[in-house]
């Protein structure tokens, strides 16, 4: 969330470095709590470096397997400790492998810009 400088009335949005550090710390916590995690990372404006005031954080998780529907998977992820608003997309490993084979705009974008903060050797 925006931070106010002590000697200024101007709000300053968290930098890419600040957000990256927070994501890496959050990742370490998630990996400890969720052994099913295969990969965690982020994409979008913070990954590309073109973030600005109001930018949110786009997270991506790959888990071994899940019985939850795709639409409900993100509900149980606590994103409140991150310095900007965030959303997470959660894929099962088979879904992720299937996505990686496709030549869609989204798949190409993830391949080129995702910043992975955790990758389990599979």
What are these regions (language model features)?
Residues 59-61:
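Short beta-strand->loop micro-motif that forms the acidic, two-metal-ion catalytic signature
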Residues 1-39, 47-54, 63-122:
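Catalytic core of pol beta-like nucleotidyltransferases
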């Amino acid at each position: 969330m925006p931070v106010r400088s002590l000697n200024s009335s101007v709000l300053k949005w968290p930098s890419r470095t600040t957000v990256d550090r927070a994501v890496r710390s959050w990742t370490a916590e998630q990996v400890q709590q969720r052994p099913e995690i295969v990969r965690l990372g982020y994409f979008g404006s913070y990954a590309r470096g073109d973030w600005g005031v109001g930018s949110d954080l786009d997270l991506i998780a790959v888990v071994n397997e899940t019985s939850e529907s795709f639409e409900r998977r993100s509900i149980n992820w606590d994103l409140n400790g991150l310095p900007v608003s965030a959303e997470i997309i959660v894929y099962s490993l088979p879904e992720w492998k299937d996505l990686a084979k496709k030549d869609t705009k989204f798949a190409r974008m993830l391949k080129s810009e995702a910043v992975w903060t955790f990758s389990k050797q599979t």
